Curated annotation (Swiss-Prot):
PANTHER family (UniProt xref): SEGREGATION AND CONDENSATION PROTEIN B
Assigned protein family: Belongs to the ScpB family.
Keywords: Cell cycle, Cell division, Chromosome partition, Cytoplasm
HAMAP family: ScpB (MF_01804)
Name assigned to this protein: Segregation and condensation protein B
GO cellular component: cytoplasm
Source organism, top-level taxon: Bacteria
GO biological process, one term: chromosome separation
Gene (UniProt): scpB
Length: 180
C-alpha cells in the first residue's frame, strides 16, 4: 500500500478526532515537508484531508453534502449495530458510567456507538454528582422503546432466558411500534 492509502486509512480510523501532525510524522516515518506534499497530492473523488490547527482530519468534500444529508436521514431510521447494542446494554445495566468505563468493559473504542445512541436519543451525557467526566445514562425514550417504566424493570440474569431473548429482540427492532 502506498503512503496515500496508509494516510487515508489512519485518518479514517481516527474518525472525527483526526490525528495530530506529530503522530502522523512518527507513524509514517517522514518529514513535515514530505507530509505536506503527501496531503497536497492526496486525491480522492469524495474525500479530502483538512488541517485544523495541528490536527489532520479526513473529511468529505462539500459537493457531497446533499447526498450525505440524505444518508444521515436514512441512517437515523436504521436499526442499531451489534456494537451499539452492546454499548447500550452496558450503559443500561451499569449507569451512570463514562465513555472510558465502557472502553474498559469492552476493551475497544466505543465512541461511534455512543454517538449513535446519543443521536437516536436512547442515551444522554450528564454531569452526575460532580464527576469530572460526563456520565452516560439511558433516557425516557429508551424506556419507551423497550416498553419498561423504569430501569429496574430490565431483565436480570436470574430471570428466564426467554424474557432476556424477548428484551434483546425488541432492542434489535428498536425502531418499531413503540417509537412512532
Amino acid at each position: 500500500m502506498d503512503n496515500h492509502g496508509i494516510l487515508e486509512s489512519l485518518l479514517f480510523t481516527a474518525g472525527d478526532e483526526g490525528l495530530d501532525e506529530k503522530q502522523l510524522l512518527e507513524i509514517l516515518d517522514m518529514s513535515k515537508d514530505q507530509l505536506v506534499e503527501l496531503i497536497e497530492n492526496y486525491s480522492s473523488h469524495g474525500l479530502m484531508i483538512q488541517r485544523f490547527g495541528m490536527t489532520y482530519v479526513l473529511t468529505t468534500k462539500k459537493e457531497a453534502a446533499t447526498y450525505i444529508e440524505q444518508l444521515i436521514e436514512q441512517k437515523s431510521q436504521m436499526k442499531l449495530s451489534q456494537a451499539a447494542m452492546e454499548v447500550l446494554s452496558i450503559i443500561a445495566y451499569n449507569q451512570p458510567l463514562s465513555r472510558s468505563d465502557i472502553e474498559l468493559i469492552r476493551s475497544i473504542n466505543s465512541d461511534g456507538a455512543v454517538k449513535t445512541l446519543i443521536a437516536k436519543g436512547l442515551v444522554e451525557a450528564k454531569v452526575v454528582n460532580e464527576q469530572r467526566s460526563q456520565q452516560l445514562i439511558t433516557t425516557d425514550l429508551f424506556l419507551n422503546v423497550f416498553g419498561i417504566s423504569n430501569i429496574e424493570d430490565l431483565p436480570t440474569t436470574e430471570e428466564d432466558d426467554e424474557e432476556m431473548d424477548a428484551f434483546f429482540s425488541n432492542l434489535v427492532n428498536q425502531k418499531g411500534e413503540n417509537n412512532d
